[in-house]
């Protein structure tokens, strides 16, 4: 057998083993090895032995670290190879096309200041501000372009679980919800002063979203809670105007449709529910069943995705772009993502994550769905290619990823000139909104990451 080590390397290894055995009180074994290797006290005394005591352990741990690094690099190489294989001259030439842009490593910024898990984030619809909420009970406001912390908001007494910017144009507010069972409203125009605190839930409030005004005079907010209910609030009056009951477990997430008529909720009861809040006494219009564990997140498909979702559903033509709540997506602790149609039928199950799915967002261009999970990855699924996973950011975070958001689009100049509507962005036609190539994630590693073109 040809020796792998040189004579000097072998001598170093032998001395390291003897020193390790001696340091761990295995004197009999050490003495036997000394005798077989001719390393008696006259050659390898106590002083020299002490110099080698920790060498074997250091070598061992360095090998483990190198192995992990090699595995990470191999995973990254596979992801890059996959991206390269599926790139064509046409797709490469469209890299600057926002409808085909996907986030890639490294992130533009890694924002660090929170002292505990970061649970949520939200982009300001107009300015380069981003808000994040954490288990440290604070909300932090950042300038995502500069990567700098602007201010820290204190008021909640327990973990901040979700946040959202919204309200009519010119009067945008920030809403936050917490394990302290409250929702707080903050005014960005007045140095983020806490203007109102909404109480009424009997458990942690896990999700909060502004709803497009219906009619224009109203300012609505919806919340989801561990008390198994959803609540709709009039933020001007500060009152709960509707309580929606139907879930039999903790309601983990809720999102409004673009027109504000429908809500999509999901929870630990393994169901997703569609609600029509325009009804005087709303009940769940649809119950989606199919996941094998709790559903952590949900999302409405934008009209831009209808052509791809319709193909997945086997439809000859897509629904009209003016309709809402035609297709939906849910992410679960069963590690899968399910796509649903308006009848509550699962049209596709996306498999690839190795742990709980914690966040979903549809690409504004409509062709892709992005997801994050406790497997520390961000994945991109091509809805126009049978939902195939076409990109994986394996190094998105060092620990579980808790949230994923895509920055809202910017209304093109002149798109709403002369219009009386001063409502939120969702009321603007998709063709009049410029896509921003800007995505952010949060994690158990206490970091907010910005992925931008």
From Swiss-Prot:
Predominantly, its location class is: cytoplasm
Organism's domain of life?
Eukaryota
Q: Name one GO biological process term.
A: establishment of mitotic spindle orientation
Spans of WD repeats, please give.
113-154, 156-196, 200-243, 246-285, 290-350, 352-391, 396-448
Q: Which residues form a coiled coil?
A: 63-87
Recorded hits in SMART domains, A to Z, give: WD40
- Give the UniProt subcellular location, in the record's own words: Cytoplasm, Cytoskeleton; Cytoplasm, Cytoskeleton, Spindle pole
Q: What is known of its domains?
A: Dimerization mediated by the LisH domain may be required to activate dynein.
Function statement: Positively regulates the activity of the minus-end directed microtubule motor protein dynein. May enhance dynein-mediated microtubule sliding by targeting dynein to the microtubule plus end. Required for nuclear migration during vegetative growth as well as development. Required for retrograde early endosome (EE) transport from the hyphal tip. Required for localization of dynein to the mitotic spindle poles. Recruits additional proteins to the dynein complex at SPBs.
Question: Could you give the subunit structure recorded for this chain?
Answer: Self-associates. Interacts with NDL1 and dynein.
Q: Under what name is this protein listed?
A: Nuclear distribution protein PAC1-2
Q: Which organism is it from?
A: Chaetomium globosum (strain ATCC 6205 / CBS 148.51 / DSM 1962 / NBRC 6347 / NRRL 1970)
